[in-house]
């Protein structure tokens, strides 16, 4: 167990936001399928899995994204794999949405009595607990929070097998939204862009990792 803990912490220390990748080194198909699987298996609020992982390997499409993604100027042309993580919009994640009903029945395979109670609880949760029905943006931001769980798991899993990564929020939302909509990737308003992440192998070693002291970020009560 001690060895496993050491291996996990080694992966966390290995991981850094890689700004430029070696374009000659590619992540194997099996390794990348493993990374994607850790995203797919990630937890989400109410188990709704409000995400889609769009793997962008087409160089022309990457260049189109690059024009409006200031945070990935070096990553887009050099990463072995580049992923757009989409989050479901209010259209799909409001308590009475068809997506939720279908997900509960077909994916979670809930019995009818459980299903009805779950829908009722979801309405209560969204309406009164977290006040998520204030706007469509509030619901989308809630869904986007879930995608960051998958994002973190994918980057950690990648680090554990020696693959580098970089999370990217540095993009012009309106332009990226337009491009994805034109490509039909937002599925008639069911999705929108949440975050991006690049994977590959570092071209150079980073400077030593720095973090706040434990006593500055942890409080016991």
From Swiss-Prot:
Enzyme's top EC category: oxidoreductase
SUPFAM superfamilies: FMN-dependent nitroreductase-like (SSF55469)
GO biological process: 2,4,6-trinitrotoluene catabolic process
Flavoprotein is among the record's keywords: yes
Residues that hold NAD(+) according to the record: 157-162
Co-factor requirement: FMN
GO cellular component annotations of the record: cytosol
Keyword annotations: Flavoprotein, FMN, NAD, NADP, Oxidoreductase
Subunit record text: Monomer.
Name of the protein this chain belongs to: Putative NAD(P)H nitroreductase YfkO
Organism this protein belongs to: Bacillus subtilis (strain 168)
Gene: yfkO
């Amino acid at each position: 167990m001690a060895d496993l803990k050491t291996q996990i912490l080694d992966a966390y220390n290995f991981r850094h936001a890689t700004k430029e990748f070696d374009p000659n080194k590619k992540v194997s198909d099996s390794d990348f399928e493993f990374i994607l699987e850790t995203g797919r298996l990630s937890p989400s609020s109410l188990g709704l899995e409000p995400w889609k992982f769009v793997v962008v390997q087409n160089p022309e499409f990457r260049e189109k994204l690059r024009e409006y993604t200031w945070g990935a100027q070096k990553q887009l042309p050099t990463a072995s794999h580049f992923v757009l993580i989409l989050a479901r919009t209010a259209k799909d994640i409001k308590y009475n949405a068809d997506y939720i009903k279908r997900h509960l029945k077909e994916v979670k395979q809930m019995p009818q009595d459980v299903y009805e109670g779950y829908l009722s609880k979801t309405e209560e949760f969204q309406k009164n607990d977290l006040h998520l029905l204030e706007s469509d943006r509030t619901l989308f931001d809630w869904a986007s929070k879930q995608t960051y769980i998958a994002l973190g798991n994918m980057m950690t899993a990648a680090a554990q097998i020696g693959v580098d990564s970089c999370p990217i929020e540095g993009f012009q939302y309106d332009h990226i939204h337009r491009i994805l909509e034109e490509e039909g990737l937002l599925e008639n308003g069911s999705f929108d862009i949440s975050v991006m992440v690049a994977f590959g192998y570092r071209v150079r070693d980073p400077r030593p990792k720095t973090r706040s002291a434990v006593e500055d970020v942890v409080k016991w009560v």
